[in-house]
């Protein structure tokens, strides 16, 4: 049977949350998605609160993934320990709270979701994701395996895609907030896209007010980032997977802009 996975780009600020609240279920119905993964690490611009996580789950997400802003809101720590539907990068140090991967029961059987963070131009010095993923895969028996890599470098994301080609169902990138036009199936049957994009203000610089971002580039370090207002967008990719083989049989961008 076909199993459709909707992967939604980073939710940015209140505009992104409002877009999710109003439109995620509609997009889920429109695409026929069976399983929805949303990156939520920028829901509070830097981090996510428990209430924001609940809003995203209530809107139709099955899993929330995180990234380099996982710990932006300290109140998420206890919530993350108690809620298996929110996962942080698996290659953070073993003692940090939360979980880096999780297996979920679905109509197509078990589905594993793994969250990784890249190391090129990223903070915190995480463990090597290319080595850790091998250890994780040895623990997973699910036929359908989904991997998100939250990374800056396109080459690092592509390398992860090719490393896992034929071994997992889909690999997608997040973090840059800019959607890439390379959604495809790799030679051995893994669905891939370098970056999903973002969910939030349409007329913005990565979700932030353009004037504030420009001020930073001009050298004004006193301005604080604030999300832009106005029309919004939701950028996402739909992966259609053969549940019998775990292979991806179709990839499709399903971006929606106001």
Region locations from a protein language model:
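Acidic, metal/ion-coordinating pockets
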Residues: 1-258
């Amino acid at each position: 049977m076909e199993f459709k996975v909707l992967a939604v780009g980073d939710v940015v600020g209140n505009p992104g949350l409002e877009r999710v609240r109003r439109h995620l279920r509609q997009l889920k119905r429109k695409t026929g998605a069976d399983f929805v993964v949303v990156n939520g690490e920028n829901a509070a611009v830097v981090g996510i609160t428990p209430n924001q996580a609940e809003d995203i789950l209530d809107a139709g997400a099955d899993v929330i993934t995180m990234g380099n802003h996982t710990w932006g809101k300290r109140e998420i720590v206890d919530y993350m320990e108690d809620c298996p539907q929110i996962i942080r990068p698996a290659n953070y140090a073993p003692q940090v709270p939360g979980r880096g991967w999780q297996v979920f029961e679905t109509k197509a059987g078990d589905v594993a979701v793994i969250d990784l963070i890249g190391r090129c131009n990223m903070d915190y010095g995480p463990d090597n994701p290319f080595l850790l993923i091998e250890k994780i895969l040895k623990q997973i028996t699910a036929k359908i395996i989904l991997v998100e890599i939250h990374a800056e470098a396109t080459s690092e994301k592509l390398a992860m895609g090719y490393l896992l080609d034929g071994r997992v169902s889909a690999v997608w990138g997040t973090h840059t907030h800019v959607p890439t036009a390379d959604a495809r199936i790799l030679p051995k049957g893994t669905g891939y896209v370098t970056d999903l994009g973002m969910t939030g203000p349409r007329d913005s610089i990565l979700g932030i007010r353009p004037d504030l971002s420009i001020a930073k580039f001009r050298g004004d370090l006193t301005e604080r980032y604030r999300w832009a207002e106005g029309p919004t967008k939701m950028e996402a990719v739909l992966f259609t997977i053969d549940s019998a083989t775990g292979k991806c049989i179709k990839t499709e961008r399903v971006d929606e802009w106001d």
